[in-house]
């Protein structure tokens, strides 16, 4: 996997992570999307929250364009009765959840945290901020496993 660094001032981690995962240029992703995610949709909010961004559903379409699908695995899935946020429960015990996600991390995909996205080659995290790091350095929330469709 090739590290592609975000230009300063750009808030396009999902575009760049996807480009690394698919081994294409970010400009190809932007062309397929029809936008770069940098339109200001919420001018009352500070940077980067003011930007349109890119939704993961758009990235699913981009991957399909290249003949791939993404399968989402949440690290710690939770459930509750409808509308009862006071009754949320984890589906798995922590040990089982970590063992489960480790099985899927043997293959390439997208690493998603609450506020950032990176590419994963099955061994290392390729961070669009310009670093190659270990999975332990990331607050992983969801893993999107890349599969040929």
Model-identified regions with their sequence ranges:
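Context-gated lysine
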Residues: 5-10, 96, 106, 141, ...
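Active-site nucleophile-adjacent alpha helix/oxyanion-hole segment immediately C-terminal to the catalytic cysteine
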Residues: 1-50, 57, 61, 65-71
């Amino acid at each position: 996997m090739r590290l592609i660094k975000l230009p300063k001032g750009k808030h396009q981690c999902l575009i760049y992570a996807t480009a690394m995962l698919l081994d294409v240029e970010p400009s190809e992703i932007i062309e397929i999307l029809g936008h770069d995610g940098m339109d200001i949709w919420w001018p009352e909010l500070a940077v980067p929250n003011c930007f349109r961004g890119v939704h993961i559903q758009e990235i699913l379409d981009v991957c399909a364009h290249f003949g791939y699908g993404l399968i989402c695995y949440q690290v710690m899935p939770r459930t509750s009765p409808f509308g009862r946020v006071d009754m949320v429960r984890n589906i798995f015990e922590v040990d089982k959840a970590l063992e489960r996600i480790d099985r899927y991390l043997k293959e390439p995909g997208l690493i998603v945290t609450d506020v950032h996205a990176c590419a994963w080659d099955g061994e290392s995290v390729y961070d669009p901020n310009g670093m190659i790091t270990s999975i332990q350095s990331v607050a992983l929330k969801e893993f999107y496993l890349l599969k040929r469709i």
